[in-house]
Design a protein with these regions (language model features):
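Boundary/entry segment of secreted carbohydrate-active catalytic domains
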Residues: 2-45, 188
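Metal-dependent enolase-superfamily TIM-barrel catalytic cores that perform enediolate-based chemistry
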Residues: 183-187, 191-195, 201
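Extracellular/periplasmic catalytic domains that process cell-envelope and extracellular macromolecules
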Residues: 14-18, 53-55, 88-91, 192-194
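Short polybasic/polar patches that bind polyanions
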Residues: 10, 146, 193
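Enzymes and membrane/adaptor proteins characterized by extended Gly/Ser/Thr/Asp/Glu-rich
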Residues: 29-33, 37-38, 42, 52-181, ...
């Protein structure tokens, strides 16, 4: 991906700035419409969506498993997305993002990307190995993502496991010790970012002490800011 300084305009208009705030989900696409009945995975960029990206200076996209069926196909899709962004008035490259945590949450096919056992198992190795496996797993994931043209990963998960009834975080957490979770999370951030991947730590303000899955309901975190 070219550097932003090399391609960007000196100043962006209000419309361009607004477009840069948007990150779109193109999980499915049907030429006849993209309503609830459309379940055709978008694996290549249609011209109509390419125009949306270029005409509205879209800042980023998020890829899901529907968009990533093979190595060659994903590389081609990433290239098509960046070509569309290069035709925008701002000339800014896209943030191409994904959820590839390295455990249960993985959007890349198992035969395309390296599978890991997840953060809880990394946390279990802390006493003997420190942050070693956190760094190494992030490095492997980062190298695979950059090879596919992806530059943002919604990871690591730094929620602290505090609720045994939590239906959505559980094994995605490094554990129940806040200090250990922070050390392992920082190690993964370093592993990702030193290999070209922008990280997005999650989940704010904390999903480790809830009994509701935020994908299906509204969790309540009953803690003070302190």
């Amino acid at each position: 991906m070219p550097s932003i300084k090399a391609v960007a305009k000196p100043a962006l208009s209000l419309e361009e700035k607004l477009g840069q705030k948007l990150m779109l989900d193109f999980r499915y696409f049907c030429e006849q419409g993209t309503g609830k009945h459309c379940r055709t995975p978008m694996t290549k960029l249609p011209e109509s969506l390419a125009r949306v990206i270029s005409d509205y200076n879209i800042g980023g996209v998020i890829l899901f498993s529907e968009n990533t069926q093979s190595i060659e196909q994903t590389i081609t899709l990433s290239h098509q997305l960046q070509v569309a962004a290069s035709k925008s008035s701002s000339k800014l490259p896209l943030f191409i993002s994904i959820d590839q945590e390295g455990g249960r949450v993985a959007r890349l096919p198992r035969d395309v990307a390296t599978s890991f056992t997840g953060n809880m198992s990394i946390g279990a190795t802390y006493k003997q190995h420190g942050v070693d496996f956190a760094t190494k797993s992030a490095t492997v994931i980062a190298n695979e993502l950059t090879a596919l043209g992806i530059n943002v990963n919604y990871a690591p998960t730094i929620d602290v496991n505090m609720n045994p009834d939590n239906p959505v975080i559980n094994v995605r957490s490094f554990g129940e010790n806040p200090q250990r979770v922070s050390e392992l999370g920082a190690a993964q951030v370093a592993g990702f970012e030193s290999n070209g991947i922008i990280t997005s730590l999650k989940h704010f303000p904390g999903h480790g002490d809830t009994h509701v899955d935020s994908h299906t309901g509204l969790p309540n975190v009953a803690h003070s800011k302190s």
